[in-house]
């Protein structure tokens, strides 16, 4: 069987095929948004690696009891870094040899390795340079506790000055007296 095509029909078919092949489809566009957020929580770090060194205590002269003697005073800095806006509280414990109430502990320096009943050197740590406000322990550990030192962070490193005092007139044996204080920051 022989099929005959008219030349004009072939031309129309070719032109139609070219047209169909060159037809373009427009793509549909959709837009959406992506929300990006970050939640920054309260966070702090503390650096209490400094040493408060009471050197030169002499209870028979400079630091003698009575009107002529004075307490031996020193200071040290504790560094803290908290996210901006964080409310924090710095507290200190009584130390290894401390006694007294949490709000106003009596801290004691002792000769390392000495018997438990060996003489100790009383001292304390204060929040102010007038030596009026003892650095308490902060019983509940909350950020509003009166025993510690409260701060609202600005995002920068902060130094908190701790003031120490050894009361005058303590006649104790010679030696190197030490104590270890745990410093905490609660936020």
For every predicted segment, state its role.
Residues 1-15:
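Bacterial Sec-dependent N-terminal signal peptides
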Residues 21-26:
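N-terminal signal peptide c-region/cleavage motif recognized by signal peptidases
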Residues 30-117, 150-187:
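N-terminal small/polar-rich segments of proteins
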Residues 93-95, 124-128, 136-138:
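Predominantly extracellular/luminal cell-surface or secreted proteins
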Residues 129-131, 187:
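Solvent-exposed strand-loop boundary residues in beta-sheet-rich modules
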Residues 131-155:
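Extracellular beta-sheet repeat scaffolds used for adhesion and glycan interaction
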């Amino acid at each position: 069987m022989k099929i005959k095509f008219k030349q004009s029909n072939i031309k129309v078919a070719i032109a139609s095929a070219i047209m169909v092949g060159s037809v373009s489809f427009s793509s549909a566009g959709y837009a959406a948004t992506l929300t990006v957020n970050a939640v920054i929580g309260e966070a702090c770090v503390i650096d209490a690696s400094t040493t408060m060194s009471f050197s030169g205590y002499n209870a028979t002269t400079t630091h003698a009891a009575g009107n002529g003697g004075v307490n031996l005073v020193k200071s040290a800095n504790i560094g803290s870094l908290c996210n901006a806006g964080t409310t924090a509280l710095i507290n200190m414990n009584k130390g290894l040899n401390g006694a007294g109430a949490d709000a106003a502990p009596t801290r004691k320096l002792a000769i390392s390795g000495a018997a438990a009943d060996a003489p100790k050197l009383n001292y304390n740590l204060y929040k102010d340079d007038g030596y009026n406000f003892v650095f308490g322990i902060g019983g509940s550990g909350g950020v509003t506790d009166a025993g510690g030192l409260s701060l609202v962070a600005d995002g920068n490193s902060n130094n908190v000055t701790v003031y120490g005092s050894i009361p005058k007139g303590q006649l104790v044996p010679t030696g190197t007296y030490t104590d270890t204080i745990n410093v905490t920051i609660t936020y």
